[in-house]
């Protein structure tokens, strides 16, 4: 069984570039362009790790983190964002990232 990583990011170049790099390392990768699609993929199962942006239209990365840690606490979450601030980092960590 392979390790499956879900990448949630509204920036296509980041999402696809990171996905390709991880696939070259032997990981199974699923891509989602927003939080809503990402949460649907998580609900289907078979996700071992989530990498999410914070600032996305619709369901934000913060909401994704809260939902994953609340409903699927065994799935670790990594935040990858260009909108870094101390407040964003603290909020993400408080939510379980």
Q: Model segments located where?
A:
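Short amphipathic alpha-helix used as the core "switch/output" element in two-component signaling
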Residues: 40, 62-74, 91-94
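His-Asp phosphorelay/catalytic-motif detector in bacterial-type signaling
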Residues: 2, 46-48, 71-76
């Amino acid at each position: 069984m392979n390790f499956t990583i879900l990448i949630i990011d509204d920036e296509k170049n980041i999402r696809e570039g990171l996905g390709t790099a991880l696939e070259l390392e032997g990981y199974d990768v699923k891509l989602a362009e927003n939080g809503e699609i990402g949460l649907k993929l998580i609900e289907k199962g078979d996700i071992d790790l989530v990498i999410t942006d914070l600032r996305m239209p619709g369901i934000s990365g913060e909401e994704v983190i809260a939902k994953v840690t609340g409903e699927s606490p065994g799935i670790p979450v990594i935040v990858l964002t260009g909108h870094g601030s101390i407040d964003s980092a603290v909020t993400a960590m408080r939510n379980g990232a």
